[in-house]
């Protein structure tokens, strides 16, 4: 069993996170419960930033808020001096509600609506990452209408395949995102933006995938982009002030995962950018990166209460908990794997193989297959580790189950940052079906 960040076994034999006993958290806030180790988030943020500071380079480390967005999380990102990557009007609204500096917000997405782009312009955000020709035309029209101007990056697909799950590989040519780097699309986009009266082309962006454990993809992407930048300088007199190489830095979910440290990713990116800038005679552009999962993923733990059990003789022992695919859909969606422990008996031998089932009325609602735990019983507390990314943000009300609360823990204190949904919350937007209305 691998404990991340400040997680440890305390004197009572319980799991402790951020100096707070997991049993206390479950008793006070209920389960399922998302618990975030704030100290670990801070540590990761500082590691990414310090690597650029040590190199003496201009850079922005933008938190990819789709991993986990709440007012408190955005405020924590601001406190750590991060920029912010948003991908919807809702994420932008959350950032505004949190008081995040608009000039450090970058707006991504492949189908931004007119209303979302208008919102971005009205709040004077720092940059829009343009994804397609439709968006260029729409943005130009809105800028004329509102009298605003905007800096943009062009999202390109460099044709670099990250060694990761197909569903989250986004840098290949066959992708819903961005302009293809090799078929002339990017050149057409550059021409269109350079002709604009209101849109300023700041640079280019790419994202090659997620849960990446080496740096080869980032190096190759940088090489391909700089080769094109050299051509674009000659063709359009365009010099990229910003190079955004995205995120996708991996974390350790299980013992099979071997991610690099944050500084190792950044140092290799810096090396690749410096080398290619020198090769083609460019000044080093400002480098942007977008860590999301790598900032919050292993800082999150979900606490569940054990309920029923079912034994299939000679096959498997099922242990059911009070959550499931409604609070963590990743196992069903991506076949994601997690480690877990009995939080109230974490020091005991984990020597009985069981499978953890969710409570949803869905045969595929399985959180973990074949994991070793102590002999668990009803009422035991199960901790599933590394649920900080894409757990709460992908949570849903399937089976009309309320979404869990979220707690931040740090220095022995717990702070509720998202309230648990109630049944009243689930029906508050519903309207009755009225019969007998005359037409």
Swiss-Prot record:
Gene Ontology MF terms in the entry: diaminopimelate decarboxylase activity; pyridoxal phosphate binding
| Cross-referenced InterPro entries | Ala_racemase/Decarboxylase_C, DAP_deCOOHase_LysA, De-COase2_C, De-COase2_CS, De-COase2_N, De-COase2_pyr-phos_BS, Orn/DAP/Arg_de-COase, PLP-binding_barrel
Q: Which cofactor(s) are needed, names only?
A: pyridoxal 5'-phosphate
In this UniProt entry, the residues modified to N6-(pyridoxal phosphate)lysine are 66
The pathway where this protein functions is: Amino-acid biosynthesis; L-lysine biosynthesis via DAP pathway; L-lysine from DL-2,6-diaminopimelate: step 1/1
Q: Which Gene3D superfamilies match?
A: Alanine racemase, Lyase, Ornithine Decarboxylase, Chain A, domain 1
Spell out the HAMAP family in the cross-references. Answer: LysA
Job description of the protein? Specifically catalyzes the decarboxylation of meso-diaminopimelate (meso-DAP) to L-lysine.
The similarity comment for this entry is: Belongs to the Orn/Lys/Arg decarboxylase class-II family. LysA subfamily.
Q: Can you say what this protein is called?
A: Diaminopimelate decarboxylase
Q: What organism is recorded for this protein? A: Bacillus subtilis (strain 168)
Organism lineage reads as:
Bacteria, Bacillati, Bacillota, Bacilli, Bacillales
Gene encoding the protein: lysA
């Amino acid at each position: 069993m691998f404990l991340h960040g400040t997680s440890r076994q305390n004197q009572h034999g319980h799991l402790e996170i951020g100096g707070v006993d997991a049993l206390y958290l479950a008793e006070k806030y209920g389960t399922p419960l998302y618990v975030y180790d704030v100290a670990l988030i801070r540590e990761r943020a500082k590691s990414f930033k310090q690597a650029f500071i040590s190199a003496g380079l201009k850079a922005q480390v933008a938190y990819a808020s789709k991993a986990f967005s709440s007012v408190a999380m955005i405020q924590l990102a601001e406190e750590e001096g991060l920029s912010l990557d948003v991908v919807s009007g809702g994420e932008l609204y959350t950032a505004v509600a949190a008081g995040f500096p608009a000039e450090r917000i970058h707006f991504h997405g492949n189908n931004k609506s007119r209303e979302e782009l208008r919102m971005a312009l009205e709040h004077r955000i720092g940059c829009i990452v343009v994804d397609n020709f439709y968006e260029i035309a729409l943005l130009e029209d809105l800028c004329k209408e509102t009298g605003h101007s905007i800096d943009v990056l062009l999202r390109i697909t460099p044709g670099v395949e990250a060694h990761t799950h197909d569903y989250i590989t986004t840098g290949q040519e066959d992708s819903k995102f961005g302009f293809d780097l090799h078929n002339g699309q990017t050149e057409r986009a550059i021409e269109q933006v350079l002709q604009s009266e209101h849109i300023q082309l700041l640079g280019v962006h790419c994202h090659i995938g997620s849960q990446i454990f080496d740096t080869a993809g980032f190096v190759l992407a940088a090489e391909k982009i700089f080769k094109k930048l050299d051509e674009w300088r000659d063709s359009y007199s365009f010099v990229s002030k910003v190079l955004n190489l995205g995120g996708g830095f991996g974390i350790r979910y299980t013992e099979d995962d071997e991610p690099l440290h944050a500084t190792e990713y950044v140092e290799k990116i810096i090396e690749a950018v410096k080398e290619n800038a020198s090769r083609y005679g460019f000044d080093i552009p400002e480098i942007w990166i977008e860590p999301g999962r790598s900032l919050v993923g292993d800082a999150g733990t979900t606490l569940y209460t054990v309920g029923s059990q079912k034994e299939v003789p000679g096959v498997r022992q099922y242990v059911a908990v009070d959550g499931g695919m409604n609070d963590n859909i990743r196992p069903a969606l991506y076949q994601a794997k997690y480690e877990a422990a009995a939080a109230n008996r974490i020091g005991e031998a984990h020597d009985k193989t069981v499978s953890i089932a969710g409570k949803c009325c869905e045969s595929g609602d399985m959180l973990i297959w074949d994991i070793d735990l102590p002999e668990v019983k009803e009422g035991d507390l199960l901790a599933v580790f590394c649920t900080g990314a894409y757990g709460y943000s992908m949570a849903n009300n399937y089976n009309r189950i309320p979404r869990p609360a979220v707690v931040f823990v740090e220095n022995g204190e717990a702070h509720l940052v998202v309230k648990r949904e109630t049944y009243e919350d689930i029906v508050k937007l519903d309207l009755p079906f009225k019969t007998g209305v005359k037409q």
